C-alpha cells in the first residue's frame, strides 16, 4: 500500500468532528442519541456531528474518513464504547484520513452511561452530554504526537533450564531464532529431575533425557550452566544482559526474555519433619519407591498429610499438584503391597480433570481418606525409637483417630526461592505477587506477558502447576516472544512522560514510583530523564512530581483541567 502522508495541523484552529454511536440498542436503547448529537453541535470548536448505528462498522469507518477530508476536520471525538476495545480501530481510520492518530478522544457513553444507568434514561442522556463535552474540551488542546521506531535484536534469552525453560527455548529455536538458555545449576532438567512419573503413569526420565539432548544438540541454542544473571539493561527488542558463567562475565544481547525459573518444595517446620528418616516429602518418596528403598519395602502402613504449608494464612494458595501426587504415591504403595494400610489426611481433595480417576481408583483399592480442618490439624509424635504416631480428629466421628504408620509423607507447598525471584524481578522490572511468584500482566488477556514489554513468564515461576501445563505455558510464552522477534522494528507509543528539566528538582520521587523502571536520575545534572522506549504512559510519575515538572503527553495538565472545568460546569 502507498505510504500515508500525515497532514500538519499543529498550528490550525481546532475543527472537531463528533461521531455519536447508537451501538444498536446498547446505547440508543437508553440514551437519547439524537439529543446528544444536537448538543454536541453547540460545543465550541465542533464543526460537524454524525450519528451512526454502529460507528465501528467498516462502512462507517469509510464514511468517517470521507467526512474528515470533506470537512477538513483536525480533531475527532467518538462517543461510543470503551477505548480499551475500539480506540486502535478509530485511530487507524484517522491515519487513513491523513491525521495524526493521537488527535482523537473517546467518550465512553456505553460503559459509563447506558449500561450503568439503564433504568434512568434522562440521567444517562445528561451524563452522555457531559462526557462528550469533556472529551471535546480535551481533544481541542491535543497536539500531534510522534512515535519511535526501535530496531529488534532477533534473539532470545531464556532464564531457567527446567522443562518449561527448555520447551520455550526449543519452540523459539525451531523457528530459527538464536536462544541463550541460562541455568544456575551445572545440569539441565530443573524440578523435572525429581519427578518419577506423570499423573497418568508415564515415566518422566526418558522424556526429560530426550528434551535435554534436543536442547544441547540444537544449533540455535547456547546453553550456559552454572550461570547467574547479574544485570539487565534495555527494553523490548534491545535488551543487554550480563551473565556470570562460573565466574566469567558475559554480555548477551537479545530482543525478548522468557523467565522460567523453577520453584521448590517447602521444607516444613511441623509434623516432625527432619526428626525421623521415615518422614518424607512427596518427591523424596518418589525416589525411595523408585530405588526400592528398604523403608518402603518393609512398610505395613503409610500416612499422607495434605496442604502442608499451603492454604494457610501465610500461603493461602493451593499448590495444585499435591493431591494428585499423594494419591499417585498411595497407589504405588498399594501396588507394591496390596495389604498395606494407606491413609490420606486431607482438607479438600483437588484432583483436577481426569485426575479424578486416580481418586476413584485409590478408593477402590482401599486407600482411606480422613478429612480434617485447619483448626484441628493432625498431630505427629516421634518416639525415641523412631516410631511414629499420628493423631487426627475425624470430622464424621468427631473423635480422634490414632495411626501408627511406618511411613509419613508430607505434601508440602510449592514455593518460590524469594531472593532469586526478587532479584530477577528488579533486574527485568517485572512484578511478583504476594506469594513471591511472578505476576502476569492480565490473567485472561495477557496470561504469559509481563507488564514490561518483551518479557514473558512460564512454568513454576508463574505459579504451581502440573508438567503438561508448564509445557503448554512455555510454548505460549515462546509464541508471544516470537511475535516480537518476527518484526524488523517496534513502534513505541506516543503517550509517554516528558521531564521539564528547568522545573525538575531531582527529588527522584518519579524514579521510585515508576513501575516500569523507565526513569533515570542523571547524577551530573541532578535531574531526572524518561527513557521513552520503556515508558508506558501510566502517568504515575506526573501525579507524583511535586514541582509538576513531568507532563504525560496526551494528558497534559491543561487538558485535564479543561475536562474538570467542563465536568463541573454542568
PLM feature spans:
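Residues forming the flavin
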Residues: 1-570
